[in-house]
Amino acid sequence: MILGLGHVDLVCGDLERSLAFYAAVFGPLGLQDPALFEGERGEQIHYLRFPAPGSGSLGLRQALERQEFELYAPGFHHLALTVDRRDDVDVAHVAAVAAGAEVLHPPRAWPEYHPQYYATFFLDPDGFRIEVSAARDARLV
């Protein structure tokens, strides 16, 4: 039986910039300091831990070379994080703007997803699409 998603790793164009961005945006919501591991290339992988028990972690590691992210190329599309309350979505949005993120959609209700769905969408420093949502009892997919 699958219990959940343990972790997701993002390969970053500038690891230090990405670490600073994720700490600034999600630190106020409880994202914990990274646990460090060595990757298969000998690089450091920084696993940012989510505060809820069993909620997994987000790994950040340095790219071999800088490439532009393409949303609809094979691979990663977006990262969706769930928070407790609408206020937390707003906190993430304000922090993302302060950290220089390009905002795709400011916080609003998305009734086409679920009657209680409330979310914001923005890009991280590498252009990865990040969604932060709050939806009590909403299970999408």
Language-model regions, residue ranges each:
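Core segments of cupin and vicinal oxygen chelate
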Residues: D9-G56
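Long, continuous compositionally biased terminal/linker segments
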Residues: E43-D84, V91
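Short glycine-/small-residue motifs
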Residues: S57, E131-V132
